Amino acid sequence: MLACVDIRAEVFTTLPASLHYRGEPNEWVRVTRPGQKLHSFLEGPAFDADGNLWCVDVPYGRIFRIDFSGQWTLAHQSDGQPHGLARLPDGMFAVADYRHGLTRFDPVRDTVVSICEGVNSERFRGLGDITRAQNGDLWFTDPGRSSLSDPSGRLFRLREGASTPDVMLANVPYPNGVALSPDGRFVYLAATRANAVWRLLADAPDPVYPMVGLWVQLSGGLGPDGLAVNADGFVAVAHGQAGRAWVFDALGDPVACVRTPGGLWTTAVAWHPDGARLAIGEAQTGSIYVADLGSVLAAAKGKAS
């Protein structure tokens, strides 16, 4: 096993002051960040086919597009609370919205339509994050206010062409980021309040709930938030309230610790289409950080082979 490399990320861009929210704290802020005023809370970065980076502002219902030069455009605003984005083949985005459930955002028409708001006549408790599998299935999390004292968060899968999602897990202490291995066999799940990343089979033979293993145990901070897997199977983990993101190989060995030199609220990660550069969302300063991990990943691949 190679030694874990410590890397300092660089600021790519920061939300401009002209886009700061300046009103009174809304309910989301009062509950999740008591006593604070937030100008934004960035989550869910996702690259489009042209290399633009999209991200969401959870409490204020905003979706931003960031171009190559780091310029921000407000692409959409609503009364929702978008937490995560997954790009769809037609250029639209599936959105995990804490308030409105699973929706579809069309960036060309600037429209949002509902995909589903709940399951079995029960509304979702509050969606957290989402990813799209190669076969078209949508995997998304429903943490609500779950934690170690109430491990009732859920993981869902909406199969391609289906209208109702399946409950895959219902016992997670705040399920958050979710990602799949390149071959679609494994699902990685951030159990934020357990400070751990779990792993399960996407198509397990179990008749009800699949067997789940603790894949990586973190320490410190709040816990893992967003997850992202590149084409070579390297798993990036945003370590919430720790000011860093981790990169693990497919065996779960740490390859790199990428530190953000600004705030500590590292919320989300996204691999650039080149598979070497990692974008990290940091909500305290409203910044997107970038780290080029090409040489580190190449060394790790060479060691594995």
Which role fits each region the language model picked out?
Residues 62-64, 101-103, 154-156, 196-198, ...:
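A short loop-to-beta-strand structural motif that recurs across blades of beta-propeller domains
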Residues 195-196, 216-250:
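Loop/turn-rich, solvent-exposed surfaces of beta-rich toroidal or solenoidal domains
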Residues 32-50, 78-101, 120-138, 145-146, ...:
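Beta-rich, blade/repeat-based domains predominating
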Residues 26-35, 70-76, 113-121, 164-170, ...:
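A short beta-strand motif characteristic of beta-propeller blades
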Residues 13-62:
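Beta-strand-rich domains and repeat architectures in extracellular enzymes and scaffolds
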Residues 58-59, 98, 146-153, 192-195, ...:
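Short, solvent-exposed loop/turn segments at conserved positions within beta-propeller repeat blades
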Residues 1-26, 149-152:
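Blade/loop signatures of beta-propeller domains
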Residues 200-207, 292-300:
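Short loop/turn segments immediately following beta-strands, especially the blade-tip
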